Amino acid sequence: MYLIEPFFKLSALENDIGQQSRLLNAVIDQWRYNGQIIGREIPLYLTEEDGEQGFAMRVICPEQDSLLPENNNQSVNQAMEHAEKSGLNFQGFQIIADDLNADSTAECSQPAWQMLYTTHLQSCSPLHSGGDFSPIPLYKQLKNQPHLSQDLIKWQENWQACDQLQMNGSVLEKESLNEISEVNSTLSKHGRYLAAEIEKES
């Protein structure tokens, strides 16, 4: 995975930083639900690049080219259009570094088999290759199914929250453990539903 800095040039005559931040956070959310960026805590800041005022952010991406427009889904493009209407134009990104603490992304995005897997410690796609257990970027398989990709991220967040609670061992430990270990729990049923839907798409 890679640490990347996207830049949005500010071309609006009037600055409403609150509104502009909300629009850019909408882009961040859609990038995240499409699997183009990983994680939820994304720093957003005003900066200058090549003499142009604008906004930048620091994100973790599964691949060097994750933020290229061809990887966008319809929801990402809509969020980008809303930002552009307010004078925020995506100018591109620079690769800062290879993230040495992150998992390596799967080289084959269409393996013979794959699985859903996550833990409270993981910061990567919950879709893993059956061949080498590497995470597969969601946009590689689900770009045309944004609702499914977002649902998968929400499932991962719920699973990780339960895993964290049972690891902490003080609050809701039994209930959380049941959710991630019982075959007929809500989380397990949701995971099986998602696996079946992903199988249809891939």
Model-predicted segments: where are they?
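Intrinsic low-complexity, intrinsically disordered or marginally ordered coil/linker segments
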Residues: 1-202
